[in-house]
From Swiss-Prot:
Keyword Phosphoprotein found: yes
SUPFAM superfamilies documented for this protein: RNA-binding domain, RBD (SSF54928)
A GO molecular-function descriptor: mRNA binding
Ranges where the RRM domain occurs: 188-266
Biological processes per GO annotation: formation of cytoplasmic translation initiation complex; mitotic cell cycle; translational initiation
Cellular component GO terms, alphabetical: eukaryotic 43S preinitiation complex; eukaryotic 48S preinitiation complex; eukaryotic translation initiation factor 3 complex
InterPro entries: eIF3_g, eIF3g_N, eIF3G_RRM, Nucleotide-bd_a/b_plait_sf, RBD_domain_sf, RRM_dom
Positions bearing Phosphoserine: 198
Taxonomic source organism: Drosophila melanogaster (Fruit fly)
Protein name: Eukaryotic translation initiation factor 3 subunit G-1
Similarity comment: family membership: Belongs to the eIF-3 subunit G family.
Length: 269
């Protein structure tokens, strides 16, 4: 009677039985990189081997972030090691959030606070700075600019359309010799305000001499201290020169102050 033949299984089947179907996941670290090897079944129910490579880098994080990484995991990740698990966690790009209150948001949308826009404009060189800080102040460029403005203002005064209203003779430009009741002509007089205390008659003459000839200048001074009281009167020989002076000097920066120039108001007797 023949003996029963022993049926031997292959070594691959024995290995598969020993590992319970799939080998365990392994991790190795070499040359600053971590290699994670895992096994799984694909759609065709075939065993596949997946190797993931991670680059190990060190970074400085806030204490709260480092403490949060030590929290005890739960659920499907209860037995996972520190760090994300590819089976349960999907790592996306880092998003940095910045919280703004309503006031900061309004300031951010305010076009007047746009640093790319400069509200300052020089009256001398048309640069993006105040006229007081102009590097060309007092140079030939400043002189030419004042002469051009004076010519333009004089031409505008001459070419101004005449209205049908009655104009007294002493107010007409053609009646330059006609004087008022006080014995002087104030039609070509201007008042310059916001002058500094250190202003002198020589400074006042230097300020207006390039615009046109003057017949009289008066700088108001304090009787006790002798310092300038902040205003002065200049009488030009021609009314068009006075108009040009108002056009040029009104709003002009002088001695760290912004001048205010207007027509001199006649005094009541």
């Amino acid at each position: 009677m023949p003996g029963v033949e022993t049926i031997k299984s292959s070594w691959a089947d024995e290995v598969e039985l020993d590992y319970g179907g799939l080998p365990p996941t392994t991790e190795t670290v070499e040359n600053g990189q971590k290699y994670v090897t895992e096994y799984k079944y694909n759609k065709d129910d075939k065993k596949t081997k997946v190797v993931r490579t991670y680059k190990i880098s060190k970074q400085v994080v806030p204490k709260t972030v480092a403490k949060r990484r030590t929290w005890t995991k739960f659920g499907d990740s209860k037995n996972d090691k520190p760090g994300p698990n590819s089976q349960t966690t999907m790592v996306s790009e880092e998003i940095i959030m910045q919280f703004l209150n309503s006031k900061e948001d309004e300031k951010a949308n305010d076009p007047l606070l746009d640093p790319t826009k400069n509200i300052a404009k020089c009256r001398i060189c048309n640069g993006e700075h105040w006229s007081v800080n102009c590097p060309y102040k007092g140079t030939a460029m400043d002189t030419n600019m004042m002469e051009k403005k004076a010519s333009a203002a004089a031409a505008a005064a001459v070419d101004a359309p005449k209205s049908g209203k009655y104009v007294p003779p002493f107010l007409k430009d053609s009646q330059k010799g006609a004087l008022g009741m006080r014995g002087r002509d104030d039609t070509a007089a201007i008042r310059i305000s916001n002058l500094s205390e250190s202003m002198t008659e020589a400074d006042l003459e230097e300020l207006v001499k390039k615009i046109g000839p003057q017949s009289k200048m008066y700088l108001a001074r304090d009787k006790n201290t002798g310092l300038c009281k902040g205003f002065a009167y200049v009488h030009f020989k021609q009314r068009k020169d006075a108009a040009a002076a108002i056009e040029i000097l009104n709003g002009h920066g002088y001695d760290h102050l912004i001048l205010s120039v207007e027509w001199s108001k006649p005094q009541n007797n």
